[in-house]
Amino acid sequence: MATLLQLCQPFDHAVMAAIQQLSGAMMDKIMLVFTFLGEETFAILLLIAVYWCWDKRIGEYLLFSLYTAMSLNGLLKDIICRPRPFLNDEFSDLRYVKVKGLLVDTEHLSSSWSFPSGHSQTAGSIYGSLINGRKLGIKVCGIAVILLVMLSRVYLGVHYPTDTIMCA
């Protein structure tokens, strides 16, 4: 798998460079909001809200989905051991949005692996589960959130595109 990801580096670099051309102070803030939608903390709060305010069975289903995704994510990160783009010399020409605060913990990011993207996997498991069997409007919104979380992780420079594509 690591060799396959290595072969994807030219693709990853080209896509990251194209996405980061959108950069700016306002876009940084927008992308941080999209990233927050893939945070485990937000997913747990959403799960609790669904359980208590909407449907207990769906809340339990989301809990199982999130737990499974989080467990697999940690296991895969430890098996693949792919460094983050901002730690990869081949990607040194790209930007990395350094933010102090709750949303992006740079110390944690520097000591954790890139593949697979936990935010994208969380978004895929939660929003993907929520759209299952729903009306078209809900499906479109769920898919949009998943894609925006994936985009935000690449834009912020904390994941390669393949990290987000292969796990969402």
Q: Where is each model-derived feature located?
A:
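N-terminal transmembrane-helix/juxtamembrane module of multi-pass inner/ER membrane proteins
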Residues: 1-43, 73-108
